[in-house]
From Swiss-Prot:
Annotated gene: pckA
EC number annotated for this UniProt entry: 4.1.1.49
Family classification: Belongs to the phosphoenolpyruvate carboxykinase (ATP) family.
Keyword terms: ATP-binding, Decarboxylase, Gluconeogenesis, Lyase, Nucleotide-binding
SUPFAM superfamilies tied to this protein: PEP carboxykinase N-terminal domain, PEP carboxykinase-like
Protein name listed in UniProt: Phosphoenolpyruvate carboxykinase (ATP)
């Protein structure tokens, strides 16, 4: 439908009480264009198509319980019962065009086409009951060669603002008018539950992707992160088909020479915090693609954890939480509207989504050169891994496939020790192909572009959680500064027992006694037994990849004494 026809329909509607809108086309009072959604949409709802941020604020405050404006101008929202992702409820449709590519199993659970269509119809039926719905058109991927067009159709202003921030926004009204048909569409009816008796459902929540239909359907969860990670899953599938490597990583580069660094790590290990460096330009905090020409960000915004946030520790993130930012599930003072980032009474997974423009040192377009350094982040609550280690090529592949971090003991009675978590490629819930495919692509890129690789532990030292202490953020930043300056590469190393890491003997700004972990433990025997316990967990977890692993790759892991 061209612009002239759209304007003609708008003019007719404004001058007559009759509805001359072709079936499936909807007119919004806020925009001058029409938008074709789907033949299944009834046409009764008012459509807000890429509305201004202020409009979404007004809608959330007026119609969504729990919404408020904080003292810094951010919008507080509530995601309902679900305050985090539901990985056990994610499904991928098993269909001929993609079924041979996918790593089926507990990560990628198969769904049949009929179940997907039942959920799709259920979602659209729910959206059709709404007086208003929101449509956000945007892009995933800053490199025009690889970007995809994404359309989000949802019933909450909170979800619309979230995706307005996280997608790459059309530059102007003309670009939006020429957006055309999306490559992928997300139907978010998260307020409405899935039918638990539909074949393949594990609960009333469902997050389903169909690569043939190029659609994603969300039911039974209002947690906005499902949309963001759904797009990452789509890119994790599409990019290797185009010969480029998608990564769950953050990225920044030096202001003066374009020296680029990629940070890998699971949630809570420091990707967002450590990539937001005032002395470097931010490319992105979570999702990137490494191509033959360099790296590009998939997203138009950042999604930062807010627990214990302070301006002193993380000034760039703290100051980004202003008008236009979305704060999820935080607690605030009803009188002053100041947020208490230490209060986790709703959830520990408090989050904020804000556009890249909120970071003063963000680079536009969010594209960088080939990385000079690869940094793998882990939060080792066992207190065994060094604050920094230098990795060889096989160790990079091994630890990338393993994707280790550890969770601290919770509040449950009897739980006193850390729990090891392994997430392949530092993003197992989002990968689609077998992990070795991504690892082989990474090894190829590292070799081709001579990138150095490091493993950094942001977790505990001097003992496990409960005995030792958390490695200070200032020390981690000093390590990263020494990597960027090239100083750390020149410092002699000592090989660590069992794990075989090359550990620098010193680092500017870091106490030398914490660099080799055993030196910080008062109980040396306890250290050795804990190290052997952790090594066994590594060895056991790697067994599921051994059928596709070379002997050199297996040998890159921990080796216990006979």
């Amino acid at each position: 439908m061209n612009q002239a026809v759209a304007e003609s329909i708008n003019k007719s509607l404004k001058s007559s009480t009759a509805d001359y809108t072709p079936k499936g086309y909807h007119i919004t009072e806020l925009e001058s264009d029409s938008i074709y959604l789907d033949e299944h949409f009834s046409g009764n709802a008012k459509i807000f198509h890429n509305p201004a941020v202020a409009v979404l604020y007004e809608q959330a405050l007026a119609f969504e319980h729990g919404s408020a404006i904080t003292s810094t101008g951010a919008l507080v929202t509530r995601s309902g019962v679900k305050t985090g992702r539901s990985p056990k409820d994610k499904r991928i449709v098993k269909e001929p065009s993609s079924q041979d590519d996918i790593w089926w199993g507990p990560v990628n659970i198969a769904m049949d086409d009929l179940s997907f269509m039942i959920n799709r119809e259920r979602a659209i039926d729910y959206l059709n009951t709404q007086e208003k719905i929101y449509v956000i058109d945007g892009y995933a991927g800053w490199d025009p060669k690889y970007r995809i067009k994404v359309r989000v159709i949802c019933a909450r202003a909170y979800h619309a603002l979230f995706m307005h921030n996280m997608l790459i926004r059309p530059a102007n009204r003309e670009e939006l008018r020429n957006f055309g048909e999306p490559d992928y569409t997300i139907y978010n009816a998260g307020q409405f539950p899935a039918n638990r008796y539909t074949k393949g459902m594990s609960s009333s929540s469902s997050i389903a992707i169909d690569f043939a239909r190029k659609e994603m359907v969300i039911l039974g969860t209002q947690y906005a992160g499902e949309m963001k990670k759904g797009i990452l899953t789509i890119m994790m599938y599409l990019m290797p088909k185009m010969g480029v490597l998608p990564l769950h990583s953050s990225c920044n580069q030096a202001r003066n020479n374009g020296d680029t660094t990629l940070f890998f790590g699971l949630s809570g290990t420091g990707k967002t915090t450590l990539s937001a460096d005032i002395n470097r330009e931010l490319i992105g905090d979570d999702e990137h693609v490494w191509t033959d020409t360099g790296c590009f960000n998939i997203e138009g915004g950042c999604y930062a954890k807010c627990i214990d946030l302070s301006r002193e520790k993380e000034p760039e993130i703290f100051d980004a939480i202003k008008f236009g930012a979305v704060l999820e599930n935080v607690v605030y003072n009803e009188y002053s509207r100041k947020v208490d980032y230490n209060d986790v009474s709703i959830t520990e997974n408090t989050r904020c989504a804000y556009p890249l423009e909120h970071i003063p040192n963000a680079k536009f377009p969010a594209i960088a050169g080939h990385p000079k350094n690869i940094i793998m982040l882990t939060c080792d609550a066992f207190g065994i891994l060094p604050p920094v280690s230098r990795l060889d090529a096989n160790q990079v592949m091994y630890h990338f496939i393993q994707g280790y971090t550890a969770k601290v003991a919770g509040t449950e009675v009897g739980v006193t020790e850390p729990t090891a978590t392994f997430s392949s490629c530092y993003g197992e819930p989002f990968i689609v192909w077998h992990p070795t495919k991504y690892a082989e692509m990474l090894a190829s890129q590292l070799h081709k572009h001579s990138a150095r690789a490091w493993l950094i532990n942001t977790g505990w030292t001097g003992g496990s959680h409960g005995v030792g202490s958390r490695i200070k953020l200032a020390y981690t930043r000093a390590i990263i500064d020494a990597i960027h300056s090239g100083e750390l590469e020149k410092i002699p190393t000592t090989k660590m027992d069992v794990f075989g890491f090359q550990v620098p003997n010193s680092c500017p700004g870091v106490p030398s006694e914490i660099l080799m972990p055993i030196n910080g433990w008062a109980d040396k025997e306890k250290y050795v037994s804990t190290m052997h316990k952790l090594a066994k967990l590594f060895i056991e977890n790697f067994k599921k990849f051994q059928d596709k692993a070379s002997p050199e790759l297996v040998a890159a892991g921990p080796i216990l004494p006979q």
